[in-house]
Amino acid sequence: MTQLAIGKPAPLGAHYDGQGVNFTLFSAHAERVELCVFDANGQEHRYDLPGHSGDIWHGYLPDARPGLRYGYRVHGPWQPAEGHRFNPAKLLIDPCARQIDGEFKDNPLLHAGHNEPDYRDNAAIAPKCVVVVDHYDWEDDAPPRTPWGSTIIYEAHVKGLTYLHPEIPVEIRGTYKALGHPVMINYLKQLGITALELLPVAQFASEPRLQRMGLSNYWGYNPVAMFALHPAYACSPETALDEFRDAIKALHKAGIEVILDIVLNHSAELDLDGPLFSLRGIDNRSYYWIREDGDYHNWTGCGNTLNLSHPAVVDYASACLRYWVETCHVDGFRFDLAAVMGRTPEFRQDAPLFTAIQNCPVLSQVKLIAEPWDIAPGGYQVGNFPPLFAEWNDHFRDAARRFWLHYDLPLGAFAGRFAASSDVFKRNGRLPSAAINLVTAHDGFTLRDCVCFNHKHNEANGEENRDGTNNNYSNNHGKEGLGGSLDLVERRRDSIHALLTTLLLSQGTPMLLAGDEHGHSQYGNNNAYCQDNQLTWLDWSQASSGLTAFTAALIHLRKRIPALVENRWWEEGDGNVRWLNRYAQPLSTDEWQNGPKQLQILLSDRFLIAINATLEVTEIVLPAGEWHAIPPFAGEDNPVITAVWQGPAHGLCVFQR
């Protein structure tokens, strides 16, 4: 039987050098680590890792080749009160594995035990890691490096974006390949998108609770192997990595960046009753935030929280991010529940992971976007991230909806959000692009549902409609649900136009939810994380071509307005912005706080956004000059206006002089 050589303690994971494979695994509290390899017949062969450098266990297996399936058994104390849950009866996934063979099914054997260990061996049904070799021809690929001021983000789900697209070949719909298909790329280019932000593509598992209900985790925020691509989005699991890189290369050639939504806050092992896949059995005490009683701090709402202040976990997270940039050429990351990244346990801008990213010559050069909160006390950190990060701006989302759908927001508050929420983000040398403005996202109502539903309708999720937020700031315009009279449809359309215009012509970085430009509806489900079906898949055959054209025209208009693309804070008298009332005069203090919802925003001294958010048709006196409406607001008859615009109720128009 081949013996393991000591090998090297770096890099982490399994790496083939042409002669064999070097294996490394971090565990500060293990007493012994067994490498378990499986032959073509499924026969298991075990080897003790002979090397032990600090907290890194390592060994080298001569003559091992790519395609080898492996896992680990980690020996150590079973002391739940101390946070130790070692159980060598359970085969464990390498946290740095780049391919997984097998499925993460709901099975009692995939649990370590709660108070007492479960010593039933699970190797027969446990997923296995696969050794891969990395050879890929990137040709002349180069990152687009779109300036932040010119960035337009499109948030999409790999499967949902293309699964029903009639012009994409059936055999690749819903896959990584489809992202790089010319039809998809041409669509994104015509729309004006510069960055495709993908919901999680790292391998994830469906929670046992969902599996028992016949549902699955659709969004992917339940990670199990952070270096491995989710195989369900590949035409073949063996070629997933190349399919993904082919898509990125094609998108880059079209000038489109790729941003990955990544989950570094918790794992699919969930709470103490959850499954055992990897980290819990490798070094529970190091990888997770542990309470004094040995249970987890649940700052994520998912049962556990990764301890990103532990040096080894920081190294693991940093290596993961570098892998996606260096191996897959991704252009940035959106970090789910990113406040966890800064916990020490209190949130700090100089937290270890933030510092590591800041000091990394690779990671400090890509786009970094934070979802700036978690669910624990002190978890709401909007505006408090380090300067390298942009942040989801929920202030903007709520203000836009309140102004146009609830009519209860003063002009001053609306203007503050329109101006990149400078009261929140203008600090520490940050630029307006730090505000990622959004009206909708994967989490919540779609744009169409914002104007068709007053209440969430999440019954299909199996939680009796208890899940999902109740604070939607939506307005069904008088009838719950889709459809209705022509007047109702037109009023809803006008509200959608107003919200899109506010999003795409505001200062900051706009993020558009895929499908909002189509009129996609989830029929009132505002938490469709477990709906892998026609509720979430974009139905291209039913897309509103008029709304798509309207959205594209707004995006292309945005790119013509210097005040929006120069990425500089607006200052009084700098010519970037003037705020005027319905009479083209500067607003008084009282008008800012108590005036009617009528406003004119003059950008770059040439582009005028005239707003009438009242219930009545109102005359708006335009500033001096000859004005004409511009696409998408220009009609066939587009006369020059020199004096007054008849502003329809809840309406707006954009002019140029």
Curated annotation (Swiss-Prot):
Q: Which segments carry the region annotation Disordered?
A: 458-479
Site annotation Transition state stabilizer: residues:
443
- Return the SMART domains for the record: Aamy
Instruction: Provide the top EC class.
Output: hydrolase
Which InterPro entries does this chain map to? GlgX_C, GlgX_Isoamylase_N_E_set, Glyco_hydro_13_cat_dom, Glyco_hydro_13_N, Glyco_hydro_b, Glycogen_debranch_bac, Glycogen_debranch_GlgX, Glycoside_hydrolase_SF
Q: Which chain positions lie within coiled-coil regions?
A: none
Which residues are named in the active-site annotation? 336, 371
Q: Which SUPFAM superfamilies match?
A: (Trans)glycosidases, E set domains
Q: Which GO terms describe its biological process?
A: glycogen catabolic process
Keyword Cell wall biogenesis/degradation set for record: no
The biased composition feature labelled Basic and acidic residues covers: 458-467
The entry's function note states: Removes maltotriose and maltotetraose chains that are attached by 1,6-alpha-linkage to the limit dextrin main chain, generating a debranched limit dextrin.
The record's listing under NCBIfam families reads: glgX_debranch, PRK03705.1
Q: Which protein family is named in the record?
A: Belongs to the glycosyl hydrolase 13 family.
Which protein are we looking at? Glycogen debranching enzyme
Species of origin reads: Escherichia coli O139:H28 (strain E24377A / ETEC)
Gene this protein is translated from: glgX
